[in-house]
């Protein structure tokens, strides 16, 4: 079975706008539903301990929406962040909702956004039991990684299904007009992951401007998760037209790729 690279829309920024006024508008569920109407293959959220955007009830409602609409639900987050008032912890959320995919990300509480991947040598011992637990719930496990990450074979042994390439460095180089070298590094990392049986996702600062070039250079990317750029572009172009433009890019730049 094969599929083209899939688009999962991160709706965190919708929640940021809603929370800025403390009311229910804009409606995160309505926005996610519009993305699905436009053809998005999935919805991504990254709940944080400070509830700065996505909240517990959003996760519950989005889980129900994605299952009803037959698209994937991807929950991202730091599995080591301690539960606290208003935040039950990433694993508790995933245990409750059983998303299709859980993407583990090593972000700190004070980070504005994710900016690095896991160090497998240092953090692997702590990750392994969490991976086992998540997979017992029937969820696919993806780890957020930097380009040129080492230890991919170890991750495969732990039961990891996919990696998500942190594409921030590529986006910076593309903006500067000098992305060829870093693209080669991303392509090499993707191939190394695929050689040990890992699927490859990608995300962070991907946009209509740079997505096509990335997918044209990096082989067999199964999924891209895009939020900030897509929501920013949607302010000018509309949400449904923007999602469709991303889908057009996916259709134009890569053929069907093997599912993992």
UniProtKB/Swiss-Prot annotation:
Its biological purpose: Catalyzes the complicated ring closure reaction between the two acyclic compounds 1-deoxy-D-xylulose-5-phosphate (DXP) and 3-amino-2-oxopropyl phosphate (1-amino-acetone-3-phosphate or AAP) to form pyridoxine 5'-phosphate (PNP) and inorganic phosphate.
Catalytic activity, as annotated: 3-amino-2-oxopropyl phosphate + 1-deoxy-D-xylulose 5-phosphate = pyridoxine 5'-phosphate + phosphate + 2 H2O + H(+)
Subcellular location: Cytoplasm
EC numbers for this chain: 2.6.99.2
GO biological process: pyridoxine biosynthetic process
Annotated site (Transition state stabilizer): 164
Keyword Transferase: yes
Annotated active site: 46, 76, 204
Native source species: Xylella fastidiosa (strain Temecula1 / ATCC 700964)
HAMAP family with a match to the protein in the record: PdxJ
Protein name: Pyridoxine 5'-phosphate synthase
Positions that bind 1-deoxy-D-xylulose 5-phosphate: 48, 53, 113
């Amino acid at each position: 079975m094969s599929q083209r690279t899939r688009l999962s829309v991160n709706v965190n920024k919708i929640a940021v706008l809603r929370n800025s006024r403390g009311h229910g508008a804009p409606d995160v569920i309505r926005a996610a539903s519009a993305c699905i109407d436009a053809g998005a293959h999935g919805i991504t959220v990254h709940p944080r301990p400070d509830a700065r955007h996505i909240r517990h009830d959003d996760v519950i409602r989005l889980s129900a929406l994605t299952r009803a609409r037959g698209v994937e639900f991807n929950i991202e987050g730091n599995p080591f962040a301690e539960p606290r008032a208003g935040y039950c912890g990433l694993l508790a959320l995933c245990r409750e909702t059983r998303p299709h995919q859980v993407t583990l990300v090593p972000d700190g509480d004070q980070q504005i956004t994710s900016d690095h991947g896991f160090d497998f040598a240092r953090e692997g011992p702590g990750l392994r039991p969490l991976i086992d637990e998540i997979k017992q719930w029937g969820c696919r496990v993806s780890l957020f990684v930097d380009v040129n990450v080492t230890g991919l074979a170890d991750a495969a042994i732990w039961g990891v299904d996919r990696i998500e390439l942190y594409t921030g460095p590529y986006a910076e180089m593309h903006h500067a007009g000098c992305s060829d070298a870093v693209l080669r590094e991303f392509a090499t990392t993707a191939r190394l992951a695929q050689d040990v049986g890992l699927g490859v996702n990608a995300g962070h600062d991907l946009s209509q401007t740079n997505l096509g070039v990335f997918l044209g250079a990096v082989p067999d990317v199964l999924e891209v998760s895009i939020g900030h750029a897509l929501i920013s572009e949607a302010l000018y172009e509309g949400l449904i037209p923007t999602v469709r433009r991303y889908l057009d890019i996916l259709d134009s730049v890569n053929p069907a790729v093997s599912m993992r």
